[in-house]
């Protein structure tokens, strides 16, 4: 097999796509491979990490049902394709890996045009349109969950990606229980509105309750904090947390959307969760949540249309019951031990 010296990662959009790509990058860097990220919206997730080589390129979705949006998306897609084609010609990679979302389209199209071997990584149990379509042109798909394999038209195998780094251990002295609330990388208004009020209802049952609430980039930090303050709940409210693993490890319960990255990290640290799937995006988060709650047994799911202060507070009290929490942690440990530990790099080497 020819030695792999350079890899392009086609990625962009939300954390569900970008965070796995950054994890894959770490794996390849460890193998002395030069990595270039091509996509849109990367800067927000990189923070001050100047070591990551990336280039923001235009992208647009050609999948809109509205004619004007479809043409606008196609125009941006073409601009991104031209830019990606030039970057790929300059970088001369040995292969490219797409991580889903229409933001990865320009770089994947440019890779195919340049006759560079293409691989995909799928984070969800139900793949999106882009990965399903491009699996016809790919040499292989590495999946976070084996159940996704039935949707692809090429070799597909469950692989392991390292989770986000622990920058420092987090401790909340005297706090018990600790609840982490996460609305996803884009935030979730309904979680920011309902969850604080629901947790205020259980304050009398848990005098030492501590809440770490990540509201997302558009969340109203002051409004969310005010609800906790009025209820006498010790708390931290932040827009984003670069030490997500540290927060999860310090938590007794997580209330979150059910993106694939979150599910992987929950399984890794074995922290039970109450999942409120995002109702859009072809329902993939609901499938993720059903897998986590029904197949794994790691928590409960509340569909957004049924999310109320009352329904959530009841589930929180159930989740914090010591026996329930312990059973869920054991179930998550069992599921994690059954997952594949073959790396994406190893899978690619076997497929070339």
UniProtKB/Swiss-Prot annotation:
Gene3D superfamilies: Glycogen Phosphorylase B. One of its GO terms (biological process) is carbohydrate metabolic process. Belongs to the glycosyltransferase 28 family. MurG subfamily. The keyword Cell wall biogenesis/degradation applies. Pathway: Cell wall biogenesis; peptidoglycan biosynthesis. InterPro entries: GlcNAc_MurG, Glyco_trans_28_C, GlycoTrans_28_N. GO terms for molecular function: glycosyltransferase activity; UDP-N-acetyl-D-glucosamine:N-acetylmuramoyl-L-alanyl-D-glutamyl-meso-2,6-diaminopimelyl-D-alanyl-D-alanine-diphosphoundecaprenol 4-beta-N-acetylglucosaminlytransferase activity; undecaprenyldiphospho-muramoylpentapeptide beta-N-acetylglucosaminyltransferase activity. This is UDP-N-acetylglucosamine--N-acetylmuramyl-(pentapeptide) pyrophosphoryl-undecaprenol N-acetylglucosamine transferase. The gene is murG. It comes from Chlamydia trachomatis serovar D (strain ATCC VR-885 / DSM 19411 / UW-3/Cx). Keywords: Cell cycle, Cell division, Cell inner membrane, Cell membrane, Cell shape, Cell wall biogenesis/degradation, Glycosyltransferase, Membrane, Peptidoglycan synthesis, Transferase.
């Amino acid at each position: 097999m020819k030695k792999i010296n350079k890899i392009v990662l086609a990625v962009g959009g939300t954390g569900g796509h970008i965070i796995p790509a950054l994890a894959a990058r770490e794996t390849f860097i460890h193998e002395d491979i030069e990595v270039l990220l091509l996509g849109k919206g990367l800067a927000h997730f990189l923070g001050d990490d100047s070591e990551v080589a990336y280039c923001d390129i235009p992208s647009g979705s050609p999948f809109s049902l509205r004619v004007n949006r479809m043409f606008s998306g196609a125009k941006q897609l073409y601009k991104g394709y031209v830019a990606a084609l030039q970057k790929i010609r300059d970088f001369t990679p040995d292969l490219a890996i797409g991580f889903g979302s229409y933001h990865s389209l320009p770089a994947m199209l440019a890779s195919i045009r340049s006759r560079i071997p293409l691989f995909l990584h799928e984070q969800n149990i139900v793949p999106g349109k882009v990965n399903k379509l491009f699996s016809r042109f790919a040499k292989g798909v590495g999946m976070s969950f084996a159940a996704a394999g039935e949707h692809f038209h090429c070799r597909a195998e469950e692989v392991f990606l390292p989770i986000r780094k622990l920058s420092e251990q987090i401790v909340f002295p005297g706090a018990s229980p600790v609840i982490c609330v996460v609305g996803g990388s884009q935030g979730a208004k309904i979680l920011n509105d309902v969850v604080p009020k629901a947790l205020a209802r259980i304050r009398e049952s848990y005098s030492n309750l501590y809440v770490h609430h990540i509201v997302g980039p558009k969340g109203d930090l002051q409004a969310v904090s005010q609800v906790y303050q009025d209820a006498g709940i010790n708390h931290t409210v932040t827009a984003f947390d670069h030490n997500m693993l540290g927060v999860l490890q310090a938590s007794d319960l997580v209330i979150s959307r059910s993106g694939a990255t979150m599910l992987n990290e929950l399984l890794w640290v074995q922290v039970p969760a109450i999942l409120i799937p995002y109702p859009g995006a072809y329902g993939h988060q609901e499938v993720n949540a059903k897998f986590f709650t029904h197949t794994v047994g790691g928590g409960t799911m509340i569909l957004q249309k049924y999310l109320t202060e009352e329904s959530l507070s009841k589930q929180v009290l159930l989740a914090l019951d010591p026996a329930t929490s312990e059973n869920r942690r054991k179930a998550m440990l069992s599921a994690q031990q059954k997952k594949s530990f073959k790396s994406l790099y190893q899978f690619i080497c076997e497929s070339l």
